[in-house]
């Protein structure tokens, strides 16, 4: 019952008396509290948090809702009831009753407010209550008393707490009293470190032998598991948020009885936050059958039956030997062991090791015992085996492997290992071997459950110091949430202000009705009350049974521009465990407490320590402390570790509660590699993610489990940070040998700039020194035509993160890219401190916030203009260089401008393949704050210092044509840098920093078509449109600003810098809106020949780091039993393990033997290869001799043929000189067919098709000559006939061809039927050449092995004999086959039969024909794509043809069509067609016979149109198909040689390459 407040004096006296009594009891309780082993926090702990923070849950409500609503709430919600507590007459408080009549008693499990909207409630059990007078708190802390929050579960101090005594009228407490409670913590699964929980999951899985499904597979039940702890804290009663039930289960199998009811949890294990270990809860007192041992029935002692006590024991030693004798014996035994060891190992050191081992001593003593303590006998026995067999010798390699596998699988359960894997070993042997094995190097990476080995690292990392800055308000102002949802004030002020609360909608369940609205959950989204309370209680948003469509207004565009200012990032990655893994480090790790745990300085430290997802977001209302910490930080920043800055950079990007006021004091820099002092995103990843790597753990499983946060594959709109805090890469970067370390200082900037200064490049290409010393620092890696002005006031020596560079939020049509915050990839590779290289400097005289420049209403740019690009300047970004993986020297930009002889493989290439948003970036190069549509991630091979400060987020230009010549110099994963061929009206891509390098040999002026309304300079990056050519030394051409006409850039030397014409118009200040704007002409992209590029020579040596000059010493530095380390270079205090030391195995060691064997093996292989090579050379020589013999025969035959009656029709001898033909067997000059330069419009499709239409090696004239043997071309004058041949209307010609085809097919079928009659030889008529009576030349050709005329072949029109119609052919065919006279009759019959069978099978199986010529079906399919236009029209005509149709005679009907048939250079008459071509074949004939257009006499233009080219190409492809099919037949003839000529091999390789190309 409630005590009355009357004013009479009696009650006043009683009240005073009670107060005195209470104070005495409180003092006693405090003394006993201090004597207790468990730690209780003083008032500076949780109580002071709530006393000072003006915090309550409903205050969050006020922040979440609009201002009008909060004012309305505070006006109309007076408290209904008063909170009160009950206590006994001894002063002990037995219960606390809230205004909602919820009764809390000691022992209850309760929720406690966690302060942060994205953190669930803490769960604890109340130990006891105590009342503290506020005056005690006031004397310790200057904090004001607790104010009345507008609508809250009012803390006791805001009301006079009413006491309920058993007498019924307890005195009223003072308004300044606070009711505190001691609580014992339970830890949620998400609050223990990730690796610890993962090991638990793994152990549970391994120990689950029953195959039963574990209860934690249910995600709901999994989230209900807690871990009890013995840690006690003190909290204010106002933090209570409800009661819950917590059940205990003995193991995970018993937990299947748990039912996930409302407010119910369970625990099995305990968690110790000091040691970061889970342990069983067996220390608790448990009663019941499940916790008691079952003892067997009592067995009476056996009756004494005369057995001695030692009857079943084995005596191993009788201490009867004198010490002197024993020592002499042991000395002799060890000497024998030393001798034996020396004999085995080969060195005295091995003998000493063998003698000093414990095994040797034990063996000697055992032998002495077995010899009845006769030293002589024992020594005689020891001579046979002076050294016992080592334990490792008793185990085979396979057994060791199985043992290690068992350790990994079952831990140190040796019974299980023996049972499952090593049944032949005893358990004792396993244990003995384990203790031997655990000391071997192999055990370091295979240790089972290494999580217990990291505690010292954890303790060091997680320790907080009292100087930790706590300057973050408990919750940011509501305006910081504006960009996170469409329910922000900005969105609704203009349109939905009349809707008031109706405009809100829960971002999880999409309800529009709720008691209040808050941002909460892991992603800080707007939630209704039910969803938020569910999240607060259970750590996850409630499941949605009935999905509801979101209201339409929720799809308003999110304001991406606001993303950077508030530092908010709606990170859709896994912050759940990572961000909360620090759990209660805030309240546990304060070193101020006597037992090592610290009471939280305030509640926000605790909550942010538990799971702060921000970089350094802890709050304090103590402004003095904040100022002191700021000044202390400034001092610390003078010496910054690059690795720390990388870490800080990541945290800065990850921060979700920082504002511009805190940015200057955010980043503390310490020299040691330790955790950030403030709980950060890096700390939040997992409590030991960094510690694993600090310790150097090489266990990939540990690293993998410790870095569980995953980076998003494709960035969401606010997802611009790389959440992966993998410090393995940090260490990798840290241990990289510094590629380039040079003293900082720029050409025109003072080299004596203090480390804290930031060097800001001035916008625009202002004149500067023409030579820049090689710099390793990014501050100087800018083009030489940019002066670096230094802004170094003392007040701004600390590193300013982006607040000064954030552009004002403008309604520009394209969201501006946020500036790159700092280059971690460059600095992490340089161990010496370079703080001046980070950050972008304070807002100095060159302020970068030129907002109006961005307000041009032009069309939205696909590349997104950065504000810096408007001024021609930008901070140095961390865009990693697209350096080759094999590149050993990574040059900054200024060096690429200084080293024109740099070889291509060491050229720092621009990051070309930016169009890969699916590739995860290296975790050490986080993508800075840039809006999402442009936030393409870097591909993984982009690592290393960026040679150009290119904006890493530019998508590639839309029309890119890969530069094919670059592909050979790129790693396989890198695409060739694109050559910009896009139209000139493309909006400008912009770059934050002017690309360096002024020695581009290709004069490619950049495309510049700026927005007409843009006043400032738009820099055109050379990376996107014009990548630096690998063969061209130096960088891209200098950038001409859009305000001046572009000039062609001459190739500049190493120290020359071309100056754009308007550069003088650009002021050296930061703002250039007044720069004169010159109209820009359309830019001509002029492709120059690559011959201009000099052959790159060896690069000049890179500038050395500040370490001492190395001196060659070559002294042995360390020796072991089998090897010796030699120190080759001495660098003083610096050293590099890869270059300064080398390793030499000793002569007799195993490694030396292995190396000798490897050398011998390599020698033998080299000799074998040399022998094989010599044999091949001999074979080739013989082959060449045979070829020369054939050539001579062919020439003789050709001379005979040239004297025939066809001489009158031969070509003009003046035109058949070297320009028109090659020697007969001259191989092509290159391994790939030389392609003449394409003259004509740049249309890739036509260009490709025209290459297909080139004349082929196989051209139809002489049948007896193989197609792959180069011959002289046909009549060059044939080019004059081409216009006449192609002037016919194609449709008329096609129709005539089709009719003629049908007629000829009928004739051929009739011929075939006639020939198949009995009495005729089985040989297709098409196999016969012209009868000698028709072709006089043929007579001579048939009597020689090869007919190769030395000059021009017969005139192409000679074949069209007027009388040689199909009937004439039939007459000639009936005259009998014209076989070689030298062939015997059986040879003839066999040749005819084999040929007929082969041709019949080939015509019926097109795939076989293709495979015979090594053409894959894929290639054939590809051919159809190119040839279906004309060639497939005849397909239906020949499907029904019976019998084998010779593939060489009927061009448009036989077989599959091979359109893309590559060929070596040279134009050959076709040696395979002896039959006279038909008329339509003659139309195609010039395509095979004509030279290239460049070979035409005079200046005759090529007369073929594109349509004719296509038609000729298709006809040719059909011809090629049949020629290919004939190839096997040619090889089968006895007069043909079997080996491939060079041109033929060339031809095959080209064919395969073409076949491998993608369609």
Curated annotation (Swiss-Prot):
Record-given protein name:
Arginine-glutamic acid dipeptide repeats protein
Q: In which tissues is it expressed?
A: Widely expressed.
Notes on the domains: The interaction with ATN1 is mediated by the coiled domain.
User: Which positions carry Phosphothreonine?
Assistant: 119, 1111
| Record-linked InterPro entries | Atrophin-like, BAH_dom, BAH_sf, ELM2_dom, Homeodomain-like_sf, SANT/Myb, SANT_dom, Znf_GATA
- Record's Gene Ontology CC terms? histone deacetylase complex; nucleus; PML body
Q: What does this protein do?
A: Plays a role as a transcriptional repressor during development. May play a role in the control of cell survival. Interacts with FAT1.
Localization, per the record, is: Nucleus, PML body
Keyword annotations? Acetylation, Coiled coil, Developmental protein, Isopeptide bond, Metal-binding, Nucleus, Phosphoprotein, Repressor, Transcription, Transcription regulation, Ubl conjugation, Zinc, Zinc-finger
ZnF GATA-type span? 507-532
An example of a Pfam family matching this protein is BAH
Domain (BAH) spans 102-282
- Which segments constitute the ELM2 domain? 283-386
- Quote one Gene Ontology molecular function term: transcription coactivator activity
SUBUNIT field: Interacts with HDAC1 and ATN1. Interaction with ATN1 is improved when the poly-Gln region of ATN1 is extended.
- Which intervals hold domain SANT? 390-442
Covalent link (Glycyl lysine isopeptide (Lys-Gly) (interchain with G-Cter in SUMO2)) residue numbers: 559, 636
Residues annotated with Phosphotyrosine modification: 1252
Instruction: Give the source species.
Output: Rattus norvegicus (Rat)
- Residue ranges, annotated region (Disordered): 1-89, 463-494, 541-1125, 1154-1239
């Amino acid at each position: 019952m409630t005590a009355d407040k009357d004013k009479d004096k009696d009650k006043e006296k009683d009240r005073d008396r009670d107060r005195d009594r209470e104070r005495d009891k409180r003092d006693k309780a405090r003394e006993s509290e201090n004597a207790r082993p468990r730690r209780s926090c003083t008032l500076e702990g949780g109580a002071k948090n709530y006393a000072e923070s003006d915090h309550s849950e409903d205050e969050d409500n006020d922040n979440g809702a609009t201002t009008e609503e909060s004012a309305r709430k505070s006006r109309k919600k007076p408290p209904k009831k008063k909170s009160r507590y009950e206590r006994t007459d001894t002063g002990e408080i037995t219960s606390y009753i809230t205004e909602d009549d919820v009764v809390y008693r000691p022992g209850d499990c309760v929720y406690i407010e966690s302060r942060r909207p994205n953190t669930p409630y803490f769960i604890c059990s109340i130990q006891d209550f105590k009342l503290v007078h506020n005056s005690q708190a006031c004397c310790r802390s200057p904090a004001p008393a607790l104010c009345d929050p507008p609508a809250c579960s009012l803390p006791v101090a805001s009301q006079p707490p009413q006491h309920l005594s058993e007498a019924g009228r307890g005195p009223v407490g003072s308004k300044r009293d606070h009711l505190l409670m001691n609580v014992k913590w339970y830890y949620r699964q998400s609050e223990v470190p990730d690796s610890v929980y993962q090991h638990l999951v793994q152990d549970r899985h391994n120990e689950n032998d029953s195959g039963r499904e574990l209860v934690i597979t249910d995600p709901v039940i999994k989230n209900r598991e807690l871990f009890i702890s013995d840690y006690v804290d003190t909290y204010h009663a106002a933090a209570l948020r409800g009661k819950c039930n917590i059940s205990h289960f003995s193991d995970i199998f018993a937990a299947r009885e748990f039912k996930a009811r409302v407010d119910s949890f369970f625990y099995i294990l305990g968690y110790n936050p000091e040691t970061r270990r889970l342990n069983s809860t067996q220390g608790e007192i448990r009663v019941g059958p499940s916790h008691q041992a079952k003892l067997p029935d009592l067995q009476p002692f056996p009756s004494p039956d005369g057995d001695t006590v030692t009857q079943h024991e084995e005596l191993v030693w009788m201490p009867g030997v004198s010490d002197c004798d024993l020592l002499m014996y042991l000395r002799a035994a060890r000497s024998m062991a030393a001798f034996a060891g020396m004999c085995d190992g080969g060195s005295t050191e091995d003998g000493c090791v063998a003698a000093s081992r414990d095994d040797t001593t034990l063996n000697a003593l055992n032998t002495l015992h077995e010899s009845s303590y006769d030293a002589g006998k024992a020594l005689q026995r020891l001579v046979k085996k002076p050294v016992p067999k080592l334990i490792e010798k008793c185990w085979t390699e396979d057994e060791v492997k199985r043992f290690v596998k068992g350790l990994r699988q079952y831990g140190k359960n040796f019974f299980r290992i023996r049972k499952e894997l090593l049944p032949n070993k005893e358990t004792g042997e396993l244990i003995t071997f384990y203790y031997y094995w655990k000391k071997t190097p192999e055990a370091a990476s295979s240790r089972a459950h290494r999580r217990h080995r990291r505690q010292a690292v954890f303790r060091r990392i997680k320790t907080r110091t009292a100087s930790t800055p706590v300057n973050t308000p408990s919750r940011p102002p509501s305006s910081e949430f504006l960009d996170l949802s469409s329910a922000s004030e900005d969105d609704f002020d203009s349109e939905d202000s009349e809707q008031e609360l109706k405009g809100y909608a829960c971002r999880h369940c999409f309800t529009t009705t709720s008691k209040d609205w808050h941002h909460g959950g892991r992603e800080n989204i707007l939630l209704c009350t039910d969803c938020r309370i569910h999240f607060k209680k259970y750590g996850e948003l409630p499941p949605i049974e009935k999905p509801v469509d979101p209201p339409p207004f929720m799809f308003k565009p999110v304001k991406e521009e606001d993303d950077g200012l508030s530092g908010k990032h709606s990170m859709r990655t896994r912050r759940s465990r990572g961000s909360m893994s620090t759990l209660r480090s805030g309240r546990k790790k304060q070193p101020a407490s006597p037992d090592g745990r610290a009471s939280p300085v305030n509640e926000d430290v605790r909550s942010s320590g538990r799971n702060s997802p921000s970089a350094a977001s802890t709050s304090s209302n103590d402004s003095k402390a904040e100022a002191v910490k700021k000044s202390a930080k400034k001092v610390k920043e003078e010496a910054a570790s690059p690795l720390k800055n990388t870490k800080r950079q990541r945290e800065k990007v990850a921060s979700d509660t920082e504002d511009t006021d805190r940015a200057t004091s955010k980043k503390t820099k310490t020299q040691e590699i330790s955790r950030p002092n403030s709980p950060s995103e890096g700390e939040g990843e997992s409590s030991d993610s960094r510690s694993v790597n600090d310790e150097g753990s090489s266990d990939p499983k540990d690293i993998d489990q410790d870095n569980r946060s995953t980076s998003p594959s494709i960035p969401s709109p606010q997802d611009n940070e790389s959440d992966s805090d993998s410090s393995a890469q940090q260490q990798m970067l840290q241990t990289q040998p510094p590629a380039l370390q040079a003293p900082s200082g720029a050409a025109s900037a003072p080299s004596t700039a203090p480390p804290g200064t930031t060097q800001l490049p001035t916008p625009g290409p202002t004149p500067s020194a023409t030579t820049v010393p090689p710099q390793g620092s990014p501050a100087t890696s800018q083009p030489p035509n940019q002066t670096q002005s230094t802004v170094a006031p003392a007040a701004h020596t600390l590193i300013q993160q982006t607040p000064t560079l954030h552009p004002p939020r403008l309604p520009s049509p394209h969201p501006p890219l946020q500036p790159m915050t700092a280059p971690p990839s460059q600095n992490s590779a340089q161990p010496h401190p370079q703080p001046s290289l980070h950050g972008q400097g304070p807002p100095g005289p060159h302020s970068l916030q030129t907002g109006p420049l961005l307000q041009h209403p032009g069309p939205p740019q696909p590349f997104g203009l950065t504000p810096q690009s408007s001024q021609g300047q930008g901070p140095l970004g961390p865009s990693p260089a697209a350096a080759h993986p094999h590149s050993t020297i990574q040059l900054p930009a200024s060096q690429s401008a200084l080293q024109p002889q740099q070889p291509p493989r060491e050229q720092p290439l621009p990051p070309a393949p930016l169009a890969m948003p699916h590739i995860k970036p290296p975790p050490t190069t986080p993508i800075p704050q840039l809006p999402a549509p442009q936030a393409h991630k870097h591909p993984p091979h982009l690592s290393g210092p960026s040679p150009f400060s290119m904006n890493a987020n530019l998508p590639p230009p839309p029309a890119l044509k890969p530069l094919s010549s670059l592909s050979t110099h790129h790693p396989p994963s890198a695409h060739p840098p694109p050559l910009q061929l896009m139209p000139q009206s493309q909006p400008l891509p912009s770059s934050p920093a002017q690309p360096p390098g002024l020695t581009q040999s290709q004069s490619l002026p950049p495309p510049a078509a700026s927005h007409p309304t843009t006043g400032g300079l738009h820099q055109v990056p050379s990376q996107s449109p014009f990548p630096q050519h690998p063969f061209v030394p130096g960088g891209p051409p200098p950038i001409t600003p859009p305000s001046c006409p572009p000039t062609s850039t001459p190739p500049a030397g190493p120290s020359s810098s071309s100056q754009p014409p308007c550069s003088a118009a650009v002021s050296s200040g930061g703002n250039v809106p007044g720069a004169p704007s010159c109209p820009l002409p359309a830019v001509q992209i002029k492709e120059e020949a690559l011959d201009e590029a000099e052959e790159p020579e060896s690069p000049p040596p890179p500038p050395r780091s500040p370490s001492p000059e190395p001196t060659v010493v070559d002294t042995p530095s360390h020796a072991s039993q089998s090897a010796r380390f030699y120190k080759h270079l001495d660098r003083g205090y610096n050293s590099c393990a890869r270059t300064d030391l080398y390793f030499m195995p000793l002569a007799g060691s195993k490694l030396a033997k292995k190396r000798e064997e490897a050398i011998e093996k390599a020698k033998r292989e080299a000799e074998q290869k040399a022998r094989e090579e010599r044999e091949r050379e001999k074979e080739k020589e013989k082959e060449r001799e045979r070829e020369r013999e054939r050539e001579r025969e062919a020439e003789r035959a050709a001379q005979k043929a040239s004297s025939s009656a066809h001489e009158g029709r031969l070509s003009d001898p003046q035109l058949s000189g070297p320009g028109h033909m090659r020697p007969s067997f001259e191989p092509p000059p290159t391994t790939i067919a030389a392609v003449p330069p394409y003259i004509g419009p740049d249309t890739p499709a036509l260009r490709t098709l025209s290459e297909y239409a080139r004349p082929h090696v196989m051209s139809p004239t002489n049948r007896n000559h193989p197609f792959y043997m180069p011959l002289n071309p046909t009549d060059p004058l044939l080019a004059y006939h081409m216009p006449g041949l192609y002037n016919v209307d194609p449709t008329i010609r096609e129709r005539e061809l089709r009719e003629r085809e049908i007629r000829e097919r009928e004739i051929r079928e009739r011929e075939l039927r006639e020939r198949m009659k009995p009495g005729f030889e089985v040989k297709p008529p098409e196999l016969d050449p012209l009868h000698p009576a028709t072709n006089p030349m043929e007579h001579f050709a048939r009597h020689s092995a090869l007919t190769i005329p030395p000059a021009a072949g017969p005139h192409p029109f000679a074949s069209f004999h007027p009388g040689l119609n199909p009937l004439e052919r039939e007459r000639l065919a009936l005259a009998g086959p014209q076989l070689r006279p030298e062939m015997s009759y059986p040879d003839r019959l066999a040749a005819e039969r084999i040929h007929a069978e082969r041709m019949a099978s080939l015509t019926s199986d097109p795939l076989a024909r293709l495979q015979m010529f090594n053409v894959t079906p894929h290639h054939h399919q590809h051919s159809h794509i190119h040839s279906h236009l004309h060639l497939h029209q005849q397909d239906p005509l020949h499907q029904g043809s019976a019998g084998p149709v010779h593939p060489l005679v009927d061009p448009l009907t036989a077989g599959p069509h091979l359109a893309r048939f590559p060929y070596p250079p040279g134009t050959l008459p076709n040696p395979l067609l002896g039959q006279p071509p038909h008329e339509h074949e003659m139309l195609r004939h010039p395509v095979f016979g004509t030279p290239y257009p460049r070979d035409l006499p005079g200046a005759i233009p090529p007369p073929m149109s594109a349509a004719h080219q296509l038609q000729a190409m298709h006809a040719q492809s059909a011809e090629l198909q049949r020629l290919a099919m004939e190839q096997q037949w040619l090889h089968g003839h006895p007069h043909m040689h079997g080996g491939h000529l060079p041109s033929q091999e060339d031809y095959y390789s080209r064919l395969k390459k073409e076949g491998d190309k993608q369609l």
